[in-house]
Amino acid sequence: MMSASRLAGTLIPAMAFLSCVRPESWEPCVEVVPNITYQCMELNFYKIPDNLPFSTKNLDLSFNPLRHLGSYSFFSFPELQVLDLSRCEIQTIEDGAYQSLSHLSTLILTGNPIQSLALGAFSGLSSLQKLVAVETNLASLENFPIGHLKTLKELNVAHNLIQSFKLPEYFSNLTNLEHLDLSSNKIQSIYCTDLRVLHQMPLLNLSLDLSLNPMNFIQPGAFKEIRLHKLTLRNNFDSLNVMKTCIQGLAGLEVHRLVLGEFRNEGNLEKFDKSALEGLCNLTIEEFRLAYLDYYLDDIIDLFNCLTNVSSFSLVSVTIERVKDFSYNFGWQHLELVNCKFGQFPTLKLKSLKRLTFTSNKGGNAFSEVDLPSLEFLDLSRNGLSFKGCCSQSDFGTTSLKYLDLSFNGVITMSSNFLGLEQLEHLDFQHSNLKQMSEFSVFLSLRNLIYLDISHTHTRVAFNGIFNGLSSLEVLKMAGNSFQENFLPDIFTELRNLTFLDLSQCQLEQLSPTAFNSLSSLQVLNMSHNNFFSLDTFPYKCLNSLQVLDYSLNHIMTSKKQELQHFPSSLAFLNLTQNDFACTCEHQSFLQWIKDQRQLLVEVERMECATPSDKQGMPVLSLNITCQMNKTIIGVSVLSVLVVSVVAVLVYKFYFHLMLLAGCIKYGRGENIYDAFVIYSSQDEDWVRNELVKNLEEGVPPFQLCLHYRDFIPGVAIAANIIHEGFHKSRKVIVVVSQHFIQSRWCIFEYEIAQTWQFLSSRAGIIFIVLQKVEKTLLRQQVELYRLLSRNTYLEWEDSVLGRHIFWRRLRKALLDGKSWNPEGTVGTGCNWQEATSI
C-alpha cells in the first residue's frame, strides 16, 4: 500500500497544476454556428473566455458567475453583435467595459444585481439598438448612463424599482427610440413635468408600456399634445374609480394604438361598467384594444360610444352577455373579437368594415348572416360554428371578399359554389366538417383563388371535377381526407399553376399514372402517412419543377419494376423515412439505389429495415447484404440448365430420328407392306418410273415399292410420311445416287434417316444404286455417303443389254433376301417433295 507521504507527494503537484488551468478550458462552449455563434451558458465561468475566435458575432454567457466587468472585458470579440449576460451575478460594470464592441446591436443584462454602474459603462456601443436591463435593481432612469446611445431603438427596464416616470433630459438624444418598457415597476403617479422632454423633442414612433405599475393618479394635461405610437396600460388600476380618473388624465393624447385591460388570472378590478371608458372621448385614437376583462358586459354598444371613429377595434377575452347590433354608426375598418364569450352570434352591419377577425370565441354556435359590403378579410376560425348553407355573397353581405377562414368549426354544408365571391384568393376550411363536397363543382367560380385548405374536413373524393375552376390555385392542402377505393384519380387537370400539394394522411394505396401530368409548376408534394407499399416513380415524370417529395410514414418495401428513372432532375429532397423496407436479396437493386442517392434523401440515416426479422431496425446505409447462394446449389442449377439445354438441342436436331425410334417401338413386330422404300431425286423420276418400277413391280417375282407420288397420305407432313409410310412399312431402302441426289437437301435428309433406320432395325437394309458416275469432289461433300460407297457393295446402272441383265438380276437377289414369297409384292417412294411440288 502507498504510504501517506508518497500519496501526498503525488496529489499536491496535481492539484497545483489543476488550479492553474482556467475553468473555461475544461468546459468548451457549444459552437452553434462555426466561428459565428457560441453558447457558453452555465459553464461556471468566472471571467470572459478568450479561447473563442475573433469572428464571433453571437455570444451567450448567461448563468455564469462573472460578477465583475472591467474595462475592455470583450476586446477579443470586435465583431460581436449580440451579447447575452443574463443572470451572471454582475454587481459592478466599470468604465469602458464594452469599449471595443462598436458592432454590438443587442445587449442583455437581465437578472443582474447591479450595484455600481460607472458613467462610462456603456461607452463604445455606437451601434447598440436593443438594451435589456430587466431586474437589475434600477431605481431611476435619471442615473442610467445611456444618453449617448443615439442608435438605441428598444429600452427594456421592466421589473425594476423605478418610482418616477420622469423621463430624463437625455431622452432628447434618443431620437431613434421606438419602444420603452417600464412595466412592473413602482410608478404610481404621472405629472406634467415628467413628460416635458416629449414636448420638446417628440418621439412619434415611441411605444410605451406602463403595465403592472400600481398607478393611482395621472395629472390632467400630462399627455396633452403628446403623440405616441402605442400606449399599454394593463393591470394598473385597483378600482373602477382610479381607472376612470387616470383615463381622464390622458386627455389630449394622440396615440395610434391604445391597449387597456388586465392579464389572465391577474385581475385587480372588482367591477367594470361603461363609465370607465368615458374619458376616451378626449383622446385621439387610431386603434383600440381591450383585453382580459372577466366581467359580464351588458350594454357593450354604449360602452364604446367614444370609440366610434377608431379604425381598428379589438376585444380579447371579454365576456359579453348581450350584444345589440353593431350598426352602421361605427366607422371601424378592422374589428377583432378573440376568445370572447357571447350569448349569441352578433349581428354585424358595418358598411366601412374591411377586416373581421372573429376567432376562438364561445357561445352563439349558429352563424347568422352579416351585412358587411366593404369586407375583404374574414376570419371565423375556431368558433365551433355551423353553416346550414355555404357559401355565397348573401352569407357575408359582400362581393369584395378576398380572404375567408372557416377552419376549426362545426358542420358546413356546401350548398353554393361561391356565387358573388369570385374575388376570393385565400380559402381555409381545415378541421371543419364539410358536407356535399363531392356532389358538384363547389369551386367552379373561384378562378382567382390562390390558396385552398380542406385538410381533415371528412371529405371523401368521389367526383373527378371537385377542383374544376381553380385555374389560378397555387397551394392546395387536403391532408386527412379519403378517396374512393383509396385510389387517386385525375382530379388536378385544371390546376396548372399549383406549386404546393399536400395529400398526406389520405389512406391512399394507388394513384393514376397520369394523376400529376398537368402539374408542371409543382414544387412541393407531400404523400406522407399513406398506405403505399412500393415507390412508383412513373406518375412524377412530368413534374419538371418538383423540388421536394415526401413519402415518409408509408409502408414502402421497394420500388416498382420500372426502377427510379422517372424522378425529375429538379428533385432536391426526397423523404422516405419510417417505411417498411424489405432488406432482402430480391430488393437489392433498390437498396443499392438508396445508398447511391444519399445526397438526395432526407434523413437517410433514419431509414431502417423492417424485414426480415434478423435485420429489423438496422439502418439501410449500414446494410451489407450478401446475395450469394450456396456453391452446391449454384453448381446443381448450372448443371441442370446445361443438361436441359443439351437435351433440348439434341431433341431439336434429332427430332425425326426420335420419331423413327418411336415408330420402330410401335410397329416393330408388324408386317412390312412394301419390299423397298425408294429414295431418289425428282430429277431422276423418269428413270425410276420407266426402269425401276416397271422391271420390279411387273417382273417375276413382283416387288412392291413405296413411292412418294403414289403412296404418301395427303394432308400429312412430308417428314411424317417419310418415316411412317416409308421406313416403318418397308423391308429395304433403295437409294438412287446421282449428282442431283447429292445436291438435294431432302434426299440427304432421307438418307440420314435411313441410316438411323438401318441401325435400329439391325439389318443391312440399304441398297445403293449409282445411276450415273458422280464426281469425287462432289461426293466428298457428303462424308458419310462417300465412306459407305467406298466400303460397301453397290449397284451401278449400265445402259447396255448385258449390263441391264446383270443389274436386274443382282437387284432382285438383294430384294429377295429375307423375303417370304408373296405375289402381292412391296412398294417405295421418292425424296424431293418440295422440288417435285414446286415443279
Swiss-Prot record:
Parts of the chain that traverse the membrane: 632-652
Leader sequence residues: 1-23
Subcellular location: Cell membrane; Early endosome; Cell projection, Ruffle
Residue ranges that the UniProt entry lists as topological domain Extracellular: 24-631
All copies of domain LRRCT, residue ranges: 579-629
Stated role: Transmembrane receptor that functions as a pattern recognition receptor recognizing pathogen- and damage-associated molecular patterns (PAMPs and DAMPs) to induce innate immune responses via downstream signaling pathways. At the plasma membrane, cooperates with LY96 to mediate the innate immune response to bacterial lipopolysaccharide (LPS). Also involved in LPS-independent inflammatory responses triggered by free fatty acids, such as palmitate, and Ni(2+). Mechanistically, acts via MYD88, TIRAP and TRAF6, leading to NF-kappa-B activation, cytokine secretion and the inflammatory response.
Name of the gene this protein is made from: TLR4
Post-translational note: N-Glycosylation of Asn-526 and Asn-575 by STT3A-containing OST-A complex is necessary for the expression of TLR4 on the cell surface and the LPS-response. Likewise, mutants lacking two or more of the other N-glycosylation sites were deficient in interaction with LPS.
Oligomer status and interactors: Belongs to the lipopolysaccharide (LPS) receptor, a multi-protein complex containing at least CD14, LY96 and TLR4. Binding to bacterial LPS leads to homodimerization. Interacts with LY96 via the extracellular domain. Interacts with MYD88. Interacts (via TIR domains) with TIRAP. Interacts with TICAM2. Interacts with NOX4. Interacts with CNPY3. Interacts with HSP90B1. The interaction with both CNPY3 and HSP90B1 is required for proper folding in the endoplasmic reticulum. Interacts with MAP3K21; this interaction leads to negative regulation of TLR4 signaling. (Microbial infection) In case of infection, interacts with uropathogenic E.coli protein TcpC.
Keyword Cell membrane recorded: yes
Record organism: Homo sapiens (Human)
Domain comment as written in the entry: The TIR domain mediates interaction with NOX4.
Cytoplasmic compartment spans: 653-839
Family: Belongs to the Toll-like receptor family.
Reported effect, residue 399 to I: In allele TLR4*B; reduced LPS-response
Conditions for induction: By LPS in plasmacytoid dendritic cells.
Protein name in the entry: Toll-like receptor 4
Segments forming domain TIR: 672-815
Tissue spec. comment: Highly expressed in placenta, spleen and peripheral blood leukocytes. Detected in monocytes, macrophages, dendritic cells and several types of T-cells. Expressed in pancreatic cancer cells but not in normal pancreatic cells (at protein level).
GO biological process: astrocyte development; B cell proliferation involved in immune response; cellular response to amyloid-beta; cellular response to lipopolysaccharide; cellular response to lipoteichoic acid; cellular response to mechanical stimulus; cellular response to oxidised low-density lipoprotein particle stimulus; cellular response to platelet-derived growth factor stimulus
Record's bilayer topology term: Single-pass type I membrane protein
SMART domains recorded: LRR_SD22, LRR_TYP, LRRCT, TIR
A single MF term (Gene Ontology): amyloid-beta binding
